[in-house]
């Protein structure tokens, strides 16, 4: 399957769970035939319970609902939580679940990291927001800053087709000779255009990265990238510096208060290279950044699940929406500019690691280790990921007057 640019879409930017969850729950309530939902994380908290209620009501009124969760990201849902949904007819699957070893989750590579919802053939959501209370602004200092899009229009059919073709037993045959795809060209740029792109470990291994590279090559005035886990390969780093050196304003927003310390260490390894090359780097300080968005000039934008790190670019299953629309671009720009002004600290010369031989050696070693990490993982014993469907709970046998206990063949009193 290969998607093209679709015209005539209605695309809405959603910021954080405050906007995303009400929109998803409303769409589920309006569903008439089909709901497909896949996510990396679903927690059994306030948000998860609201999603549970929405799906249960939809299934009870006859809507076919399918849920796919990642076996690493969502390992701890209770039997009661899942069983109530499967009893109502919801098809509930885990992507590549694995048993724990000494209480630890071991299935950390090649995860299903997409966040997609499709309602009938009318509405779709694509983004980076999971289903947990930590995506709500009232969660506290650790509330995540993130984005998604709600879309109606022709591109929804592409997203639905992708979901249907990737259901169990429907995966297309592997075609190793078609692994490398050029970024789809928008030959007739206009408004309200959208392109659905994804990353897998078969034919579409670097599709999302190619669109970033193409965007940086074509940029004329401005690029803003906000990415939670930023540690891309040399090609993308070089493209950012090259754009900045030809006069493009290139701004990068990364985590200043990361949820994982190694994220900050990894990003700071690149500060010298980027800042010396003219890239403006900003650390988001208000709370953890979880977004994966970018824009270029006054028309191009992307929102999705893909980070710019080795896991997302080389191992995980990801999905983004590429958008060509001036109104959407301006909406996203206003949001990111507000973040830069109000919640970021620009990285200046005083914040750069000192250029010592020891720091240079550490940076080179760490950089090459992280960049070659996917290849190292490839040496581990490989297996084919599988989807595990959760069956409905067994119904208890009904007691009747005519039932005879097999342990007691005598007559009941």
UniProtKB/Swiss-Prot annotation:
GO terms for biological process: cardiolipin biosynthetic process. InterPro entries: Cardiolipin_synth_ClsB (IPR030872), PLD-like_dom (IPR025202), PLipase_D/transphosphatidylase (IPR001736). GO terms for molecular function: cardiolipin synthase activity. The active site is at residues 113, 115, 120, 290, 292, 297. Residues 388-413 are annotated as: Disordered. It is found in: Cell membrane. Its EC number is 2.7.8.-. This is Cardiolipin synthase B. It comes from Salmonella typhimurium (strain LT2 / SGSC1412 / ATCC 700720).
